[in-house]
């Protein structure tokens, strides 16, 4: 799959834009603050119905305007076209259009092939996309919620039933926590009432844990492969690892048993202390935790390997190569790793790629090493794009 044409109106700093892209590598170059990242965010909107950077949709409307509109014209590969036809998601054509619009004071609207989407969740996975940004460093150094969101987001793109289980689990968790707070405030505890929500948590939570374990079994080898491709010496000097921190390992009590055993503690704390919402991933480099002891370069390599493994996992399960967005990823990497990364993502194993950089000369020097690689370079200035090659 690739994006042929993008049209923007009043999106962030873009008043109006109509641009065609290469189906291979697209580089957006320019100073900081001129709109490179904003354009990538528009692509993210078309895949996930939301911004990657700003959760308040209305704040993405250009200053002084009353609406924004994002229109994408995509071309599917033959395999994905056949799959979507089988699922009645599109007409018998390789062309797909996606539109996301927002009028101030109204609800956001999403259209797929000119038909309104009844829920945003039904759209997830139709336009697979992987994004890497400087803020993703929180995946390494941030709290456990960021890492859970990472794996949940990947699985949800390829498994709609998993997404429904997550949503149902979250609803049950909110109700159980609300009940625990009432117990605390009213100084009483009623086991029959809370057991109703225990049953819901177990019903949705156990499949979530099982799916995460199965995902990691498949994901780890992909991650190690890409880490070593970016950093060939890692196999002997700093082998990377991903550990799974769960309350439900082999030989532990069941989720139902643990929920019941923690009634008193949960009532005192007013929230549920047991469940998949408490799980975490442990990232290691050699014998040390990447979060505490990894250098900035090592952490950046770790992050890139996670994201490229995400790309291959989604491709393997959906049969279509996700669009890959690399936003300002060259910082903290030496020129050798930068070259290895660009040559890697520009190879046949990947599909359409968007790269932002402040240094045009840097990306041009890399393409000189691979003149046969199809690519476009765009100069970005104040909400406008100009082709440089």
Can you annotate each of these PLM segments?
Residues 36:
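Conserved lysine of the Walker
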Residues 1-31, 45, 85, 188-323, ...:
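Conserved NTPase motor "head" modules and their coupling/switch loops across ABC/AAA+ ATPases, GTPases
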Residues 132, 136-230, 245:
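An accessory alpha-helical subdomain
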Residues 48-140, 144-146, 155-158, 162, ...:
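Nucleotide-state sensing region of NTPase/ATPase domains
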Residues 72, 352-359:
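Structural recognition of the conserved hydrophobic beta-strand(s) that form the central parallel beta-sheet
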Residues 327-329:
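Walker B catalytic acidic pair
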């Amino acid at each position: 799959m690739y994006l042929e044409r993008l049209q923007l109106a009043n999106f962030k700093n873009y008043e109006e834009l109509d641009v065609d892209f290469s189906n291979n590598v697209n580089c957006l170059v320019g100073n900081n603050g001129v709109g490179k990242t904003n354009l990538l965010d528009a692509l993210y909107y078309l895949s996930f119905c939301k911004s990657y950077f700003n959760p308040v949709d209305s704040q993405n409307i250009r200053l002084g305007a009353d609406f924004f509109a994002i229109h994408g014209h995509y071309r599917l590969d033959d395999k994905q076209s056949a799959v979507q036809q089988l699922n009645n998601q599109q007409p018998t054509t390789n062309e797909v259009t996606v539109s996301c619009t927002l009028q101030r004071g109204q609800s956001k609207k999403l259209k797929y092939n000119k038909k309104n989407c009844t829920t945003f969740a039904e759209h997830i996975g139709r336009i697979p996309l992987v994004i890497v940004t400087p803020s993703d460093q929180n995946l390494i150094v941030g709290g456990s919620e960021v890492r859970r969101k990472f794996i949940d987001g990947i699985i949800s793109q390829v498994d709609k039933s998993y997404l429904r289980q997550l949503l149902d689990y979250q609803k049950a968790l909110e109700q159980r926590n609300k009940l625990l707070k009432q117990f605390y405030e009213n100084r009483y505890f009623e086991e029959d009432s809370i057991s109703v929500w225990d049953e819901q948590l177990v019903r949705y939570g156990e499949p979530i844990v099982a799916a995460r374990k199965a995902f990691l079994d498949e994901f780890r080898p992909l991650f190690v492969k890409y880490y070593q491709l970016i950093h060939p010496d890692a196999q002997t000097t700093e082998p990377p690892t991903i550990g799974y921190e769960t309350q439900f390992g082999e030989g532990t009590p069941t989720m139902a048993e643990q929920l019941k055993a923690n009634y008193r503690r949960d009532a005192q704390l007013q929230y549920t202390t047991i469940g998949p919402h408490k799980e975490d991933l442990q990232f290691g480099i050699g014998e040390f935790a990447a979060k505490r002891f990894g250098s900035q370069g090592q952490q950046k390599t770790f992050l890139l390997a996670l994201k490229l493994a995400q790309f291959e996992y989604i491709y393997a399960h959906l049969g279509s190569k996700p669009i890959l967005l690399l936003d300002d990823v060259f910082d903290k990497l030496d020129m050798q790793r930068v070259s290895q990364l660009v040559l890697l993502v520009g190879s046949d194993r990947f599909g359409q790629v968007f790269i932002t950089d402040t240094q045009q000369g840097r990306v041009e020097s890399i393409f000189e090493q691979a003149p046969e690689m199809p690519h476009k370079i765009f100069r970005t200035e104040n909400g406008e794009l100009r082709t440089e090659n």
